[in-house]
Amino acid sequence: MKGEPIEAVNVGLQSLLSALRQNPYALDSVYLSIFTFDSEIKNVLPLTALEDVTLPIISTPDSGPTFLGKMLEELVNTVQSEQILGSINQKGDWRPILILLTDGKPSDVMAYNNAIPQIKSLNFGNIVACAAGPKADPNVLKKLTNTVVSLDTMDSNSFAQFFQWVSASVAQTSVSVGASASNTLPPPPNEINIVF
């Protein structure tokens, strides 16, 4: 992802942050973390309280592999080490929400397939995967989650609509660890296609 698409992702992340910061409920309960994945896996924003987030500028190499499986493995390790589970003696974290955005297919298919059951065992409040552009394969993402959307065009408007929808989804699907809840999402805008 280069040029306008990655710039649109950065602008979209800013709009997501702005929308969440206007929600007093989110200010009290949302933490953000961002991983990037290409030939390297980077946690470019470690888990940070919403009010303390300073977004990094996301950049991508000109070409190379898409180590989605390795990123999911890193994510599993991070969630397992950082999530506070509720108990009689302490209040737990809210169930995490995973938003995955990719413009390609996993280069590490075996690692991706092995990471899927681990991700599913973490009891995410919701997992939303977005296949952005013609090189992304929604069917591969359907192995990870039933909530897969696609963006046919990777322009500023499409990404803006996607991130607005994500911010509404975060507000709607945050539920406490251990609580059962519906993972129904708000309807997406026209620029976002639900993959069945």
For each feature predicted by the language model, list its residue ranges:
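Switch/connector loops and helix/strand junctions flanking conserved nucleotide-binding motifs
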Residues: 2-3, 41-45, 107-110, 136-142, ...
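VWA/integrin I-like adhesion module and closely mimicked acidic/polar interface patches used
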Residues: 86, 104-143
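Short, well-ordered amphipathic alpha-helices
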Residues: 13-21, 74-84, 113-116
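P-loop NTP-binding core
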Residues: 88-90, 112, 193
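Von Willebrand factor
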Residues: 1-45, 53-94, 97-101, 126-140, 151-165
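Von Willebrand factor A/integrin I-like adhesion domains
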Residues: 134-196
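Short beta-strand-loop
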Residues: 28-58, 138-144
